[in-house]
Swiss-Prot record:
Membrane topology listed for this record: Single-pass type II membrane protein
Organism phylogeny: Eukaryota, Viridiplantae, Streptophyta, Embryophyta, Tracheophyta
Gene Ontology biological-process annotations: sesquiterpene biosynthetic process; terpenoid biosynthetic process
Gene it is expressed from: CYP71BL1
Chloroplast among keywords: no
Cofactors demanded by this protein: heme
Residues annotated as binding heme: C429
Catalytic activity, as annotated: germacra-1(10),4,11(13)-trien-12-oate + reduced [NADPH--hemoprotein reductase] + O2 = 8beta-hydroxygermacra-1(10),4,11(13)-trien-12-oate + oxidized [NADPH--hemoprotein reductase] + H2O + H(+)
Organism: Helianthus annuus
Similarity comment: family membership: Belongs to the cytochrome P450 family.
EC number assigned by the record: 1.14.14.168
Name of the protein in question: Germacrene A acid 8-beta-hydroxylase
Keywords: Glycoprotein, Heme, Iron, Membrane, Metal-binding, Monooxygenase, Oxidoreductase, Signal-anchor, Transmembrane, Transmembrane helix
Biological role: Involved in the biosynthesis of germacrene-derived sesquiterpene lactones. Hydroxylates germacrene A acid to 8-beta-hydroxy-germacrene A acid. Unlike 6-alpha-hydroxy-germacrene A acid, this compound cannot undergo spontaneous lactonization.
GO cellular component, one term: membrane
Length: 488
């Protein structure tokens, strides 16, 4: 079967390549030579593609053309050109490409991140911005963060003085926060759906050859890959159907907390909508909350502690600030507003370790960018990490220096294109408030209640800073550190 699959790809691609090469526009952006059939796929590093794309951009320029299989792709690697794409010509590049995995896993790509640009996306973005992920709604889940952090304290106090794998601890806590905010406190299927979405996310982010050969999608069926994805999706769908039934059937009191599923059901059944939304649309949004909401927040927290353990003076400075500002035994929302240096640490963490390559964009009409022709249906990648480490925008860009953000107005809103961890323009991530609320609260409380040290015999420079890439980057080896409880 594998030999047949490979043979089918080779033969079909040779035919398609012949026709494609005859109609290549002559004024494309510069880029490396393209090989027959595969184009430039061989140049992509599966572990850290943002790094070798930055290296290629240093040779071919901040706007670079690649052919990945059959997909004509333009890579943007500078703040100036990111501004051109996501500000000046934002509307032209507001669409998303169609991929097999987004169609299957997210109910015909009806989640916010992968939905095609149009009336449906605008409506769902508005619902998410005003109802699901607003600053007010994020604050309403503060009690969940407190309760889950209390559970984490018990584990850390018990483990005081012994090494722990921080990733496991943080992921469990963030998973519980996000799943309770999304599904509620009473769902008995929370753990199953969390485990299933992680498995699904791993498949979604894995290198999928067929996303680069869209005309050969039939091979997904022949190879059995599509059957695996559909089976995985069906298992998740059964549980999501059950969750929706439970939410619709349970009685609600006036003082009950409204989780995100409750909000979506209420809007579907009583909202004044321009377009009706379906249960499948709701399920797509649920999955998006559980995947993007958990992975990005937990990885940011792990990277923040990885960098602070590697830079003990920064750790000490952040701890001193937290312990001088916070007067009680728990960080409050008001306290967080006064933790200026701790916020700089998180901001610098996101500069170096945020989402490296933004969700792909696609133009529906021919465009011109920086004097180059960009044909319709070109896939466009913005290398946010390359922008955040651009030597023309940052001094000593590869070093972790939180103080670089002092006395400037660079923020998360997407107005400063040298720093776009949540994207920019129409497609900026609507979950920014929710994610940052969780990250700031957790980091501050862990600095307040614990001292942290490396395992015996390990020095700061021994920490492995290599990374692997999914939605976000994460350390290739999970950070092991020793919590020292201050309450003992």
């Amino acid at each position: 079967m594998e030999l047949f699959t490979i043979f089918s790809i080779v033969v079909s691609s040779l035919i398609l390549f012949t026709f494609w090469s005859l109609k290549v526009p002559k004024n494309l952006p510069p880029g490396p030579p393209k090989l027959p059939i595969i184009g430039n796929i061989h140049l992509l590093d599966k572990i850290a593609p943002h790094r070798n794309l930055r290296n290629l951009a240093r040779k071919y320029g901040p706007i670079m053309h690649l052919r990945l299989g059959q997909v004509s792709t333009v890579v943007i690697s500078s703040p100036r050109l990111a501004h051109e794409i996501m500000k000046t010509q934002d509307l032209s590049f507001a669409d998303r490409p169609t991929t097999t995995t987004s169609q299957i896993f997210f109910y015909k790509a009806s989640n916010i991140a992968w939905a095609r640009y149009g009336n449906y996306w605008r409506q769902m973005k508005k619902i998410c911005t005003l109802e699901l992920l607003s600053a007010k709604k994020s604050r309403s889940f503060f009690y969940i963060r407190e309760e889950e952090l209390t559970r984490t304290y018990k584990f850390l106090d018990f483990s005081s003085g012994t090494p722990i794998t921080l990733r496991d601890t943080i992921q469990e806590m963030v998973n519980n926060v996000v799943s309770r905010a999304t599904l509620g406190d009473v769902s008995e299927d929370r753990q199953f759906i969390i485990d299933s979405t992680y498995t699904m996310l791993k498949s979604f982010n894995s290198f999928n050859l067929f996303n680069y050969y869209p005309s050969l999608s039939f091979i997904n069926v022949i190879s059995g890959k599509q059957a695996q994805w559909l089976k995985m999706h069906k298992e998740v769908d059964v549980i999501l159907e059950k969750i929706l039934r439970e939410h619709r059937s349970r009685p609600r009191g006036k003082n009950d907390h409204e989780d995100l599923v409750d909000v979506l059901i209420r809007i579907k059944e009583t909202g004044d909508l321009d377009m009706a939304i379906t249960d499948d649309n709701i399920k797509a949004i649920i999955l998006e909350m559980l995947t993007a909401g958990t992975s990005s927040s937990s990885m940011t927290i792990e990277w923040a502690f990885t960098e602070m353990m590697r830079n003990p003076k920064i750790m000490k400075k952040a701890q001193t600030e937290v312990r001088s500002v916070v007067k009680g035994d728990r960080v409050t929302e008001a306290d967080i507003q006064n933790l200026d240096y701790t916020k700089l640490v998180i901001k610098e963490t996101l500069r170096l370790h945020g989402v490296p390559i933004l969700v792909p964009r696609e133009n529906q009409e021919d465009c011109v960018v920086n004097g180059y022709d960009i044909p319709a249906k070109t896939r466009l990648l913005v290398n946010a990490w390359a922008c955040a480490t651009d030597p023309d925008s940052w001094e000593d860009p590869d070093s972790f220096i939180p103080e670089r953000f002092e006395n400037n107005s660079i923020g998360y809103s997407g107005a400063d294109f040298e720093f776009i961890p949540f994207g920019a323009g129409r497609r900026i991530c609507p979950g920014m408030n929710f994610g940052m609320g969780t990250v700031e609260y957790v980091v501050a409380n862990l600095l307040l209640h614990y001292d942290w040290k490396l395992p015996d015999g390990m020095k700061p420079h021994d920490i492995d800073m290599r990374e692997i890439t999914g939605i976000s980057t994460l350390p290739i080896h999970p950070l092991k550190i020793v919590p020292i409880s201050l309450s003992k």
